[in-house]
């Protein structure tokens, strides 16, 4: 059994400095459902969660990698992209999503997951959050860190 969440995101491949990046813009209305799906994936209650795009042009799937994989793997097949997550990446994503659902906004505008494709080339999965807090100035950051 899989979990499918329609209208959850927009998926776009971008190229920058000879590398491909998967840019996923998340629909704020779907964050709770995506968070629940990630929880179920981590607990191995589901083999996969599928995020349908708002424009109905593609699907993004998250699966859990078996074993102790430390780097995410991205598989691209026409209008479907699958991201296989290791335990640490899955835990990091889940923690970030839980905090975002709790607070109603993300702490930052995006998070990156380092990955490789089938050929071993490095890539990145960029998850963009439209609802996020304002950036913090350098002075404010120093103040918060006591520097």
Which residue ranges define each predicted feature?
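Positively charged, low-complexity terminal tracts
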Residues: 1-147
């Amino acid at each position: 059994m899989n979990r499918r969440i329609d209208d959850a995101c927009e998926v776009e491949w971008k190229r920058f400095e000879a590398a491909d990046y998967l840019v996923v813009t998340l629909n704020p209305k779907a964050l709770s459902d995506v968070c629940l799906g990630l929880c179920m994936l981590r607990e191995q209650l589901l083999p996969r969660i599928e995020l349908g795009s708002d424009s109905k042009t593609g699907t993004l799937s998250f699966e859990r990698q078996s074993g102790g994989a430390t780097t995410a793997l991205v598989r691209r097949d026409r209008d479907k992209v699958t991201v296989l997550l290791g335990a640490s990446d899955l835990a990091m994503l889940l923690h970030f999503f839980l905090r975002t659902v709790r607070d109603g906004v993300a702490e930052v505008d995006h998070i990156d997951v380092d990955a490789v494709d089938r050929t071993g080339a490095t890539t990145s999965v960029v998850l963009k959050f439209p609802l996020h807090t304002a950036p913090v100035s350098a002075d404010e950051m120093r103040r918060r860190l006591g520097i």
